[in-house]
């Protein structure tokens, strides 16, 4: 049986071939995965790119965008997944809508930067839900919800675009012009190591270091306010902190904790207030800083009154600090507290605590309570082991001085931290001080700060029975003369250092480290011998009488109230109390405390102190720090 053969026409074969889809690579295929049989939709990445989690290069290289709808099931699924993630992010952000973190005038307070062309949109005008249009790169990592490195790089540029007349800016008009001038000056200053934060018109340079690393660097004694002002004047982030944390204080504990955890993820360790785990202390710090920077109250006038009270007596804070730099520091911290370093905040609050105690503002103003201010400063005090600097030394010295005067339990730990800074900075060496400072005035202030701590530490040690950590015998410089003409007539630091050296000798006898009355030597086989304890006490008493004779007034307490001014009367009162206090300590040494002469001398000194206490007023106790710890009635 024969089989019939059928021949296929050439045109029919071509028609059957055209029925199959062509899967070869066309224009617009993905350039990353190089897949020839994969079609990208143009709106979503291809399936292969999603599998390997890489960026699809289709959008940037597509030359033919004729189709705008998905052409496969995989593309539809991918688009649906992106839509779900988009809606989920929108829902997560809208869950905080009822809290009203920001004021209605947030966008109104923004203005266009100086380099932005007319007619363009403001800096902060973008859709937070539009990932492609957002200027901030979004991420799902634990602490990278916002790319703050990108924001920090543009912080100084954006800062120039924010209005200086915002309601939350404390003395903004004054500081705004000073910031740009100081920043340009700092960028050309060779003493600052070529300040990494250079700011020019139309361009900026990004510093690879963090804000904390910049703020913790070693800086001159005058705080280097001009060189660091650009870091403290981040208007956008300061307003963000202020409005959000102000709203937190109006919520209950659970909502506060939830918001604080969320905000800590957004601003990872850039704010000293949210860096610590204790929520109660965080809220307390927030309330204090917000109330101090409020323009609706009289707190600004109280702040300047506190500064005046601190420097009213040049022999107190003015011994080792400069008023002009202190005012600049306080103004910067109160203008933008939430972007300031913990060191600057602690130093500012310590100043306000001192002034509030002098003015007795505890009952008149709750925000200016001295103990609350000092407790907050103590909570965020700097750690010298993380990198000591002159700024850290100044903050710890002021806090230790204040803590010693009020008799706080934190005095010993503050003294130890301050001594650590002194050792790390080698402040006993004149050469080291010259390397740390850039001017003669800073060197003088730093030397006086060293001897101030030397005097305060010895007074605290003799009261608590501790051994000192800093010894003046190893310092190669002496007490520098004060620069203030008001202090040159009578410098209390000279008498304080002389009294501290006597206290150091007394402590040596109490601790049994060395006997200052030891005579002879162990050379040539001869053993050294010691004088009696009575001779040691007489030697110390002679040194104390010499110190009393060098005072610029009659050491006899009979004419102490004939001083021409209240300040001079208080100085005389303090020195007489210090003299009798040391006399009691000398006659309480082992070996002489049980003798009749020592008992008689202790009774006489105690009687003199009691007689002086009758004339001490409350103003004296608030004005002079040295009177309360020496007065037995206090």
UniProtKB/Swiss-Prot annotation:
Q: Where does the record place it?
A: Nucleus
> Which residue ranges carry the DNA-binding annotation?
30-56
PANTHER family linked to this entry: HALOTOLERANCE PROTEIN 9-RELATED, TRANSCRIPTION FACTOR PDR1
Against SUPFAM superfamilies, the record matches this protein to:
Zn2/Cys6 DNA-binding domain (SSF57701)
The name on file for this protein is AAl-toxin cluster-specific transcription factor ALT13
Q: Name one Pfam family in it.
A: Fungal_trans
Q: Per the UniProt entry, what is one GO biological process?
A: DNA-templated transcription
What is the stated purpose of this protein? Transcription factor that regulates the expression of the gene cluster that mediates the biosynthesis of AAL-toxins, sphinganine-analog mycotoxins responsible for Alternaria stem canker on tomato by the tomato pathotype.
Its GO CC terms are:
nucleus
Q: Which GO terms describe its molecular function?
A: DNA binding; DNA-binding transcription factor activity, RNA polymerase II-specific; zinc ion binding
- Tell me which species this is from: Alternaria alternata (Alternaria rot fungus)
Q: Which UniProt keywords apply?
A: DNA-binding, Metal-binding, Nucleus, Transcription, Transcription regulation, Zinc
Cytoplasm as a keyword of this entry, yes or no, is no
Q: What else is known?
A: Gene clusters encoding host-selective toxins (HSTs) are localized on conditionally dispensable chromosomes (CDCs), also called supernumerary chromosomes, where they are present in multiple copies. The CDCs are not essential for saprophytic growth but controls host-selective pathogenicity.
Ranges of Polar residues composition bias in the record: 69-81
């Amino acid at each position: 049986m024969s089989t019939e053969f059928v021949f296929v026409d050439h045109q029919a074969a071509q028609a059957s071939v055209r029925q199959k889809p062509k899967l070869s690579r066309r224009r617009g295929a993905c350039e990353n995965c190089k897949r020839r049989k994969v079609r990208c939709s143009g709106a979503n990445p291809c399936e292969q790119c999603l599998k390997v989690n890489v960026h699809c290069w289709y959008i940037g290289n597509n030359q033919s965008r004729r189709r705008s709808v998905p052409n496969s099931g995989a593309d539809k699924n991918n688009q649906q997944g992106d839509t779900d993630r988009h809606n989920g992010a929108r829902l997560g952000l809208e869950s905080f809508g009822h809290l009203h973190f920001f004021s209605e005038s947030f966008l109104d307070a923004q203005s266009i930067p100086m380099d932005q062309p007319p007619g363009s949109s403001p800096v902060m005008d973008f859709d937070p839900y539009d990932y492609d249009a957002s200027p901030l790169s979004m991420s799902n990592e634990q602490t990278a919800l916002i790319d703050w490195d990108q924001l920090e790089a543009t912080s100084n540029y954006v800062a120039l675009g924010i209005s200086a007349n915002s309601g939350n800016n404390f003395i903004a008009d004054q500081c705004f012009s000073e910031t740009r001038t100081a920043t340009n000056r700092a960028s050309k200053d060779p003493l600052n190591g070529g300040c990494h934060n250079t700011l020019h018109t139309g361009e900026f340079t990004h510093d690879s270091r963090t804000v904390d690393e910049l703020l913790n660097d070693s800086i001159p004694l005058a705080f280097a306010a001009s060189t660091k002002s650009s870091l403290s004047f981040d208007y956008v982030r300061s307003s963000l902190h202020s409005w959000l944390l102000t709203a937190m204080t109006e919520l209950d504990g659970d909502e506060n904790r939830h918001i604080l955890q969320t905000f800590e993820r957004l601003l990872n360790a850039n704010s000293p207030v949210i860096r610590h785990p204790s929520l109660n202390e965080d809220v307390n710090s927030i309330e204090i800083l917000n109330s101090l920077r409020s323009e609706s109250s009289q707190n600004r006038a109280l702040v300047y009154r506190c500064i005046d009270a601190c420097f009213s007596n040049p022999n107190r804070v003015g011994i080792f600090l400069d008023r002009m730099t202190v005012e600049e520091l306080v103004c910067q911290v109160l203008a933008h507290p939430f972007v300031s370093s913990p060191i600057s905040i602690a130093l500012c609050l310590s100043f306000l605590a001192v002034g509030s105690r002098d003015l007795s503002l505890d009952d008149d103003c709750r925000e200016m309570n001295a103990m609350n201010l000092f407790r907050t400063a103590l909570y965020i005090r700097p750690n010298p082991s993380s990198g000591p600097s002159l700024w850290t030394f100044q903050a710890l010295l002021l806090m230790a001085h204040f803590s010693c005067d009020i008799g706080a339990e934190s005095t010993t730990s503050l003294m130890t931290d301050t001594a650590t800074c002194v050792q790390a900075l080698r402040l006993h060496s004149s050469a080291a001080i010259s390397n740390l400072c850039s001017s003669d005035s800073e060197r003088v202030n730093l030397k006086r700060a060293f001897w101030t701590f030397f005097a305060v530490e010895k007074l605290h040690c003799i009261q608590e029975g501790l051994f000192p950590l800093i010894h003046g015998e190893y310092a190669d410089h002496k007490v520098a003369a004060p620069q203030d003409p008001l202090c040159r007539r009578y410098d209390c630091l000279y008498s304080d250092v002389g009294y501290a050296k006597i206290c150091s000798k007394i402590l040596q006898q109490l601790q049994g480290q060395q006997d200052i009355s030891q005579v002879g030597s162990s050379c040539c086989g001869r053993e050294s011998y010691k004088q009696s304890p009575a001779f040691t006490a007489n030697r110390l008493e002679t040194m104390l009488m010499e110190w009393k004779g060098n005072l610029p007034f009659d050491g006899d307490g009979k004419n102490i109230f004939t001083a021409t001014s209240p300040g001079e009367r208080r100085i005389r009162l303090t020195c007489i109390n210090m003299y009798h206090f040391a006399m009691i300590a000398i006659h309480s040494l082992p070996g002489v405390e049980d003798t009749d002469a020592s008992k008689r001398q202790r009774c006489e000194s105690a009687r003199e102190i009691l007689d002086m206490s009758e004339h001490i007023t409350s103003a004296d106790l608030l004005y002079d720090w040295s009177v309360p710890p020496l007065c037995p009635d206090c």
